[in-house]
């Protein structure tokens, strides 16, 4: 640099400023893409949560319907005058360990009544802006002190804000996944229990028809 003329030094400064400006533009573009991906992920998790809730409600309704079906089968046995030996009576399905583990006893501590910790929703891309900002004096050391450096400062300020948003989104995504995993297992257990209950009811109905 000592061998460069003042004009060459100025040209070099402008070249570095142009390169730095393009770098901040690329960084900002990548940050915006990451934020958009995070928003889409949160939206998809929210939609998945609604679907899981509907599935679980459907399984709960099947469970209730099966309870009524079993009562009907018991009444039909009585109406048909079938005498069942006490040792051959069908055991109440809801007294079984598998049922109690899945549905509990209907009290406040039953699996169905346990509410997992839910993160605060982020909808329509509206994210809280972080309170942290640029360090005192700005992000860059000004050399040319022109509009390019103004844009660089603005770009880096936006990047800092987006990084704060990404941190919040990562926490929300992690919390939502942690909340949904137990529900997915609960749904699987309920589906398995309902299947077993339906199989037993079908066997009772077939036996009743064949009698």
UniProtKB/Swiss-Prot annotation:
Name the InterPro entries for this protein: SNAP-25_dom, T_SNARE_dom
GO CC annotation, single: plasma membrane
Any idea which residues bear Phosphoserine here?
A: 5-6, 20, 23, 34, 110, 161
Report the residues modified as N-acetylmethionine.
1
Q: Which Pfam families match?
A: SNAP-25
Q: What does the UniProt entry say about where the protein is found?
A: Cell membrane; Synapse, Synaptosome
Recorded coiled-coil stretches: 23-76
Boundaries of each t-SNARE coiled-coil homology domain copy?
14-76, 146-208
Q: Which domain of life is it from?
A: Eukaryota
What is the tissue specificity? Answer: Ubiquitous. Highest levels where found in placenta.
Q: Where is the lipid attached (S-palmitoyl cysteine)?
A: 79-80, 83, 85, 87, 112
PANTHER family xrefs: SYNAPTOSOMAL ASSOCIATED PROTEIN, SYNAPTOSOMAL-ASSOCIATED PROTEIN 23
Q: What does this protein do?
A: Essential component of the high affinity receptor for the general membrane fusion machinery and an important regulator of transport vesicle docking and fusion.
Record protein name field: Synaptosomal-associated protein 23
Q: Which organism is it from?
A: Homo sapiens
- Underlying gene: SNAP23
């Amino acid at each position: 640099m000592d061998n460069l003329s003042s004009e060459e030094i100025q040209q070099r400064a402008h070249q570095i400023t142009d390169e730095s400006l393009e770098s901040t533009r690329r960084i900002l573009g990548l940050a915006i893409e990451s934020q958009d991906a995070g928003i889409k992920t949160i939206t998809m998790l929210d939609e998945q949560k609604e679907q899981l809730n509907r599935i679980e409600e459907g399984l709960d309704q099947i469970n209730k319907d099966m309870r009524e079906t079993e009562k009907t089968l018991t009444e039909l046995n009585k109406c048909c005058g079938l005498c069942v030996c006490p040792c051959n009576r069908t055991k109440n399905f809801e007294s079984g360990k598998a049922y109690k583990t899945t549905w509990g006893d209907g009290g406040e501590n039953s699996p169905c009544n346990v509410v997992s910790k839910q993160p605060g929703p982020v909808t329509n891309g509206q994210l809280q802006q972080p309170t942290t900002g640029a360090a005192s004096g700005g992000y860059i050391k000004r050399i040319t002190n022109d509009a390019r450096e103004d844009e660089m400062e603005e770009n880096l300020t936006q990047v800092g804000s987006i990084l704060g948003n990404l941190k919040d989104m990562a926490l929300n995504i992690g919390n939502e996944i942690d909340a949904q995993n137990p529900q997915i297992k609960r749904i699987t257990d309920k589906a398995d229990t309902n299947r077993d209950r339906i199989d037993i009811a079908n066997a009772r109905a077939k036996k009743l028809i064949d009698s």
